[in-house]
Regions:
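Gram-positive cell-envelope targeting signals
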Residues: 1-63
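Solvent-exposed, non-transmembrane regions of membrane-associated and secreted proteins
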Residues: 35-264
């Protein structure tokens, strides 16, 4: 047995060095795994962005855009062909001043189109879709339309612009096209609220309840508008998306309310 005290010190140092070497190797391995996964996710997101853009370009070929602009855009949407691609298509939304120019789909739940594109293939960007409980002809008092708030501005990534009154003044209306008729949508309220907000309501038992709701969301708006609403006959739609603005809570959402006006 070696009784030299330096022997034990040296042996302990060797042991410590081996442990440190193993820790460094493990940390390097962990770093490479994280880096590899990050690169994989970045590549996946880029592929999904490209796929989503390609699908959008293919679908836009089914929309006839007039060569000369007018106060009432006369887009012609070939819903017959769109429904051959996906029978869940119920409309098309166009918001000028943004890149929002998409078909609207409706599934049998509110989960599927959160991460599936218009061709029903997996895509984390999802689709623009109507609440599954709503009538597919937008005849309910209030139809909710959902879409992701994306960093690259696709889907509902540009709804945030309506938080600014100056943008609203330049883009007070947007357009909704359906198989049975086309509409302008006059925005009368825009704000950020939480997922458990009383604004998240699309079912009313009476005209009085609907009128109370209209007054409620008008009060919440970032700015006032002069839009008139006849609760006895008018229907509204609500654009709904996540809010990623600074100092906002993760449960905050954009609410954009608009009243539908039938185009002649």
């Amino acid at each position: 047995m070696n009784t030299n005290p330096f022997y034990f010190i040296i042996e302990e140092e060797v042991w410590k060095n081996n442990i440190m070497k193993q820790i460094k190797i493990f940390l390097l391995f962990l770093l490479l795994v994280v880096l590899g996964f990050s690169l994989y996710k970045i590549n996946q997101i880029n592929n999904e962005l490209n796929s989503s853009q390609e699908i959008k370009e293919e679908l836009i070929e089914l929309v006839e855009i007039p060569e000369t602009p007018s106060d009432e855009p006369s887009f012609q949407v070939d819903f017959e062909e769109l429904k051959k691609i996906n029978s869940d298509v119920i409309g098309w939304i166009v918001i000028e001043g943004t890149g929002i120019n998409y078909p609207i789909v409706q599934g049998n739940n509110n989960s599927f189109y959160l991460n599936h594109s218009y061709d029903k293939k997996w895509n984390s960007l999802g689709s623009i879709f109507a609440d599954y409980q709503s009538s597919n002809d937008f005849s309910d008092y209030n139809t909710f339309i959902y879409g992701h708030h994306t960093r690259n501005g696709s889907m509902f990534g540009e709804l945030y612009k309506y938080m600014d009154v100056s943008f609203y003044k330049q883009n007070k209306t947007f357009y909704l096209y359906t198989p049975t008729g086309n509409f302008t949508a006059e925005i009368f309220s825009a704000y950020i609220d939480s997922t458990d907000s009383s604004s998240y309501n699309q079912s009313f038992n009476s005209i009085t309840e609907f009128n109370d709701y209209i007054n409620l969301v008008k009060e919440k708006s970032n700015y006032s508008t002069d839009v008139k609403i006849d609760v006895n006959k008018d229907k509204i739609i609500t654009l709904y998306s996540c809010s990623h603005e600074s100092n906002r809570k993760k449960n905050d959402r954009y609410f954009i309310h608009a009243v539908l006006r039938k185009l002649s």
